[in-house]
Each structure stands twice: as structure tokens, then as C-alpha cells.
């Protein structure tokens, strides 16, 4: 605790921003060190690692890792998504996988908002496209727009309505304790990004497709539309479904192993 007293010398009380269109950030956390909950190992019951009997042999490990890579290298960004229904159980299992992700101090600072209501999807599309038109016209710059045009990316996002499900991933900038006080969420953005990676792998494993969308400047409006609290900030929007019959993807290649891995 002495370390935290040194780091947080200010005793001034925190205030809650009353503007619903402004996302919270770490500056909204309490500055009093005594209000920060520190979780020590002595507070968590530890048990022996329970999965020793499931560790594969080296040959099995090689096979499993190769098969997983074979599946994942087929993952592509797909912008034409079919409206064909997907069982809700599949989506729930995909989100469960994302929820197994590690997080700073086990705070699990993520919220996955799953949308299947057509009217709500339409409203989300209207918000995103309105902001995207401004992004492409003014905010992004000519070079950025040119780089995206090579991939046939525009402000139009029809997949938001056609996909049977949308998954909006929010990071919890801080937590709320039962008594209403704020709780630090360490490395919240890194934690949520790791979770998003597992989510994408789970989508691919289920045989579905998506496109990673980060709706620039639309986050606060979508948070308010979805009635999410101010301590949450939109990180990513994923339409999820089957590829449409006329779906196309850029004919791209990925960097070889020798360009992405360094062995010392």
C-alpha cells in the first residue's frame, strides 16, 4: 500500500462526468490511494493445476498446432455477410471463449453486447454511417482514404443490417464496486484486445465470418443508444454470420514466419 500512497499523493475527490456523450477514462478514477482495492495472492484460493492429464504428447501437440493453424489461415475479412440465421447457442459459446481471456489482476474488463434486433441494427448502421461519411470526407485524410480504397472499403456498412448478429465489444475503463466506489481496471485496453483475438479465433472455429470494425467517433453515440454505463468505451464492432453467396475477399498473402518471428 505504501507504493500506492507514493503514486497517488493527491487526496482530491473524484467527480462523475455528467455529460452522457463523453466517454470516461482513467483520469476519472479516485485519486485517494486508500480507495484503491489491491488484490493480493493471499486473498485468492490456489489449487494444483488440474489439467496435467490432458497435456498431449509431442506428436499430438505438433498435429494439434498444425491443424489449428490450417484452420486459422483461412480466416478472412468478409464484408458481404448472409442474413441466414445462426443458432444463438453458437454465438453464446463464441462469447464464452472470449471470456476465458486473461486480464490485468483478473478484472475481466469487457462487456460483449450482442444485437439481433433488426430495428436496433438499423439504428446502429445509421449512426455508424453518418460518422463514417464525415470520417471519409474530412477526418481521415486523403492518404488514409486512398489506402482503404485499394481494399474496396468505404463509409457504407450494409453488413451491419444483413448480419444475423452484431457483437459490440466495450472495455470497462474502471469497475463499479457494490458500494458504488470505482475500482481500478489495470491494463484494461490490452486485456480487452487479447479477448477480441480469442473472439475472432472462436468465430473462425465455428465456421462463421466477420469484419473487424472500429467505428471512429461513433462510440459515445452507440454507448448511449445501447444504454451502456459511462465507464464503458466501445472498442470494436463485429458483424457475425455466414459469408454471402457473392462474397469476395482481397487476394492477399500474409507475411511468412521468418518475417514475423525472431528466434534467439
From Swiss-Prot:
Signal peptide interval: none
Reaction(s) this enzyme catalyzes, per UniProt: 2 iodide + L-tyrosine + 2 NADP(+) = 3,5-diiodo-L-tyrosine + 2 NADPH + H(+); iodide + L-tyrosine + NADP(+) = 3-iodo-L-tyrosine + NADPH; 3-iodo-L-tyrosine + iodide + NADP(+) = 3,5-diiodo-L-tyrosine + NADPH + H(+); L-tyrosine + chloride + NADP(+) = 3-chloro-L-tyrosine + NADPH
Binding positions (FMN): 75-79, 103-104, 212-214, 254
GO cellular component: plasma membrane
Cofactor(s) the protein needs: FMN
InterPro entries reported in the protein's UniProt record: Nitroreductase (IPR029479), Nitroreductase-like (IPR000415), Nitroreductase/BluB (IPR050627)
Disulphide bonds in the chain: none
Keywords, comma-separated and alphabetical: Flavoprotein, FMN, NADP, Oxidoreductase
GO biological process: tyrosine metabolic process
GO molecular function, one term: FMN binding
First-level EC class: oxidoreductase
Role, per record: Catalyzes the dehalogenation of halotyrosines such as 3,5-diiodo-L-tyrosine. Likely to also catalyze the dehalogenation of other halotyrosines such as 3-bromo-L-tyrosine, 3-chloro-L-tyrosine and 3-iodo-L-tyrosine.
PANTHER family: IODOTYROSINE DEIODINASE 1 (PTHR23026:SF90), NADPH NITROREDUCTASE (PTHR23026)
Similarity section: Belongs to the nitroreductase family.
Record protein name field: Iodotyrosine deiodinase
Annotated source species: Nematostella vectensis (Starlet sea anemone)
Amino acid at each position: 500500500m505504501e507504493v500506492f500512497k507514493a503514486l497517488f499523493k493527491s487526496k482530491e475527490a473524484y467527480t462523475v462526468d455528467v455529460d452522457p456523450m463523453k466517454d470516461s477514462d482513467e483520469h476519472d478514477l479516485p485519486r485517494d490511494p486508500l480507495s484503491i482495492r489491491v488484490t493480493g495472492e493471499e486473498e485468492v484460493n490456489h489449487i494444483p493445476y488440474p489439467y496435467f492429464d490432458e497435456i498431449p504428447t509431442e506428436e499430438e501437440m505438433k498435429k494439434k498446432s498444425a491443424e489449428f493453424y490450417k484452420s486459422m489461415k483461412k480466416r478472412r475479412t468478409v464484408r458481404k455477410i448472409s442474413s441466414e440465421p445462426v443458432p444463438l447457442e453458437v454465438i453464446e459459446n463464441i462469447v464464452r471463449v472470449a471470456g476465458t481471456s486473461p486480464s490485468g489482476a483478473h478484472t475481466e474488463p469487457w462487456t460483449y453486447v450482442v444485437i439481433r434486433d433488426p430495428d436496433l441494427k438499423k439504428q446502429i448502421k445509421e449512426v455508424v454511417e453518418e460518422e463514417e461519411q464525415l470520417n471519409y470526407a474530412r477526418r481521415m485524410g486523403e492518404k488514409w482514404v486512398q489506402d482503404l480504397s485499394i481494399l474496396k472499403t468505404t463509409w457504407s456498412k450494409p453488413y451491419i443490417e444483413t448480419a444475423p448478429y452484431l457483437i459490440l465489444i466495450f472495455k470497462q475503463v474502471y469497475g463499479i464496486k457494490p458500494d458504488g466506489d470505482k475500482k481500478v481496471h489495470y491494463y484494461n485496453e490490452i486485456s480487452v484486445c487479447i479477448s477480441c483475438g480469442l473472439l475472432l479465433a472462436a468465430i473462425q472455429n465455428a465456421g462463421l465470418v466477420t469484419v473487424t470494425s472500429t467505428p471512429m467517433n461513433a462510440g459515445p453515440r452507440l454507448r448511449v443508444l445501447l444504454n451502456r454505463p459511462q465507464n464503458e468505451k466501445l472498442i470494436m464492432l463485429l458483424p457475425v454470420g455466414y459469408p454471402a453467396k457473392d462474397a469476395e475477399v482481397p487476394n492477399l498473402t500474409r507475411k511468412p514466419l521468418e518475417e514475423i518471428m525472431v528466434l534467439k
